[in-house]
Amino acid sequence: LSRCYPWYLPGCQRHKASSHSLFRRQTPFPEVKKISGRVAVLSGLSGHIYYHWLFDVLPRFRVLYKALKAEGRSLKDIDYFVVNSVEKPFQRETLQRLGIPLEKVIESDRTPHFQAEELVVPSFAGPLDWVPPGSMDFLRKAFLDRAYLQRDQNLAETAETFGKRIYISRANAKYRHVLNEAAVVELLDRFGFVTVALETLSVAQQARVFAEAE
């Protein structure tokens, strides 16, 4: 339910819960904030990073939804949702797509120590960096829904701009750059590839571009 680095691979027998960084904390916790109502915790390790937000945090909504449905309840029965942050556009956009009002969101980055009247903590959908098929299906249904992608003319124009062959550039990334990217782009250009900087596109635009690519 609470992950920390370095994390272990599935089936690892050497992992000990006592090694969690929480138990090695030297500084005192901030003052506890008491929250009334039913609070669902969905934040995850490195949830501020696009990949971990998409494949670790968002699939917890599926786990939560299924658990609530089994009890005859729905997401509307949750008063607050705890996620890492809603600072970045992709976080706000994806939550909106899942029907989560931002006014019901608590950012764990800003409120790391709280006590809820009732706490709901769904498990992670799968091991860290090992995305289960159910999570992939959930994300596809949420963000590759044909009606959702076709209702916005801007999305269609975005896909047409980039075409069928795309190269994802990391030129603007903070880490893991392609050292000879200029040469790679020049080579791929001969084969009709168009360079895409994903950080300049919305999640919906990204989904449309990938859906239309070869």
Where do the PLM segments sit?
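The feature primarily captures lumenal catalytic ectodomains
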Residues: L1-E214
